[in-house]
Amino acid sequence: KLVSAYYAVIPDPNIPEQRVAFGTSGHRGSSFNTSFNEWHILAITQAICIYRHQQNIDGPLFLGIDTHALSEPASTSALEVLAANGVEVMMAEGDEYTPTPAVSLAILNYNRNRKTGLADGIIITPSHSPPKDGGLKYNPPNGGASGTAITNWIQDKANKFLAKNLSGVKRISYDKAL
């Protein structure tokens, strides 16, 4: 039921609790209360793609997931948008679960001694939140948590996509994304 609600329930951007709302570097919620659904992930990921372009972040994006029930469907949704935007995505071999520090380390190692072609990352995790929750965090090229200037920008852009019924969100099928 939780995963079905992720795909079936559409957030109402006029209801504050159903909008994208970044806390500590990420957006968290549950598909049962319409605070973490596919539309949230599609909108946030497109906003990140635009942010990357505006900041000239054109290296690979490291995509990690954890063991929460909504992480795999959210990862699929994010990958469809990232691929449609031409972002090179790096994932753990065999789609293994990836803790946040592993993604941070991958970003730092990749960016070491680089001035251009920098990497960043998305981690699909609600961190310490309950099993029914999902979450998405964005790590910029410094490998750490995004500051409020970044998260506010992504949040505002994502909410504009929600308000426009995802108009402007690029997406291809998962099969094509692979």
Residue ranges, per PLM feature:
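Gly/Ser-rich phosphate-binding catalytic loop and adjacent alpha/beta segment
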Residues: K1-L178
